[in-house]
Amino acid sequence: MNLKQEKIAVLLGGTSAEREVSFNSGKAVLEALLKQGYNAHPIDPKEYNVANLKKDGFNRAFNILHGRGGEDGTMQGLLEQIGLPYTGCGVMASALTMDKMRTKMLWKAFGLPVADMKVVTRETFSELDPQAVVAKLGLPLMVKPSLEGSSVGLTKVKAVEELKSAVEYALKFDNTILIEEWLAGDELTVPVLDNQVLPAIRIVPEGEFYDYEAKYISDNTQYFCPAGLTPEREQELAILVKRAYDALGCRGWSRIDVMCDAKGNFRLVEVNTNPGMTSHSLFPKSAATVGISFEQLVVKILELSL
């Protein structure tokens, strides 16, 4: 299969809150493909009807859309309908991983470790009892929308009286909110490429947690790869991440976020099925430590498209 003879659509931009990030990722991917002689073209679904890709001579899609409409199974379903192979996870894994609550429930059913949480919806918000939540989960707490990516709508709650307003804020972004125990240990993210678990990255944000600013804007967020884990811990983490990836039916590539609790136990947090591919991005950083260049990584992801 010579992919250089194919016409490739790089899907970027889109309509989610992460449109700008997707543009940055998409430009980097496009550049890498063009540099290596691929017939690649930028396609923004906000401006172009993706249902016409096949009719317009495209043979395959590199999907680097982030968030809703690109990473949640809808675009994957559309590409399946028109019979166009695409990179990354299929419909089910994409839809499921976009929903943090259901992802965690599935992991829990598989016996995998996740943070303790309380789910609040727009309908149940009026019944929220902050005292009871704090009694169960302790303080501080993390409040986040179940469906929004890129750390949008997150709040760290340090006092019981802050809980309601944090949930109200998160409800601006989604109808389902997670209130979770605060995980005080290391923050790690672990890429998986073609069933191979790549080295973990340890994230040390300047602020209290890895929010939108730390993720995309700040140059003061520190990333360590290798993560400084012992070989045994790295191995334990890799096995856990692979089990988490397989439980959800992921394929091609994904990045799984993991936190440690105060005792150092791993807790699965969430999955990015279309991880960022910008200069700040973590997947390429990890791949580089095992000798995979950005260009090689882009081609490998493309070759894994189904």
UniProtKB/Swiss-Prot annotation:
Q: Please give the catalytic activity noted in the UniProt record.
A: 2 D-alanine + ATP = D-alanyl-D-alanine + ADP + phosphate + H(+)
Q: Which SUPFAM superfamilies match?
A: Glutathione synthetase ATP-binding domain-like (SSF56059), PreATP-grasp domain (SSF52440)
Q: A Gene Ontology CC term for this entry?
A: cytosol
One of the GO BP terms on file: peptidoglycan biosynthetic process
Q: Which residues form the signal peptide?
A: none
The note on the cofactor says: Binds 2 magnesium or manganese ions per subunit.
Keyword annotations from UniProtKB, A to Z: ATP-binding, Cell shape, Cell wall biogenesis/degradation, Cytoplasm, Ligase, Magnesium, Manganese, Metal-binding, Nucleotide-binding, Peptidoglycan synthesis
- Residues bound to Mg(2+) 2 are 270, 272
Compartment(s) of residence: Cytoplasm
InterPro entries noted in UniProt:
ATP-grasp (IPR011761), ATP_grasp_subdomain_1 (IPR013815), D-Ala_lig_Van_CS (IPR000291), D_ala_D_ala (IPR005905), Dala_Dala_lig_C (IPR011095), Dala_Dala_lig_N (IPR011127), PreATP-grasp_dom_sf (IPR016185)
* Organism superkingdom: Bacteria
Residues recorded as binding ATP, renumbered to this chain, are 134-189
**What are the binding positions for Mg(2+) 1 in this chain?**
257, 270
Q: Where are the disulfide bridges? A: none
Q: Which cofactor does it need?
A: Mg(2+); Mn(2+)
Q: What class of enzyme is it?
A: ligase
> Per its database record, what is this protein's job?
Cell wall formation.
Q: Which family does it belong to?
A: Belongs to the D-alanine--D-alanine ligase family.
Put simply, this protein is called D-alanine--D-alanine ligase
Species assigned in the record: Haemophilus influenzae (strain 86-028NP)
Report the gene name: ddl
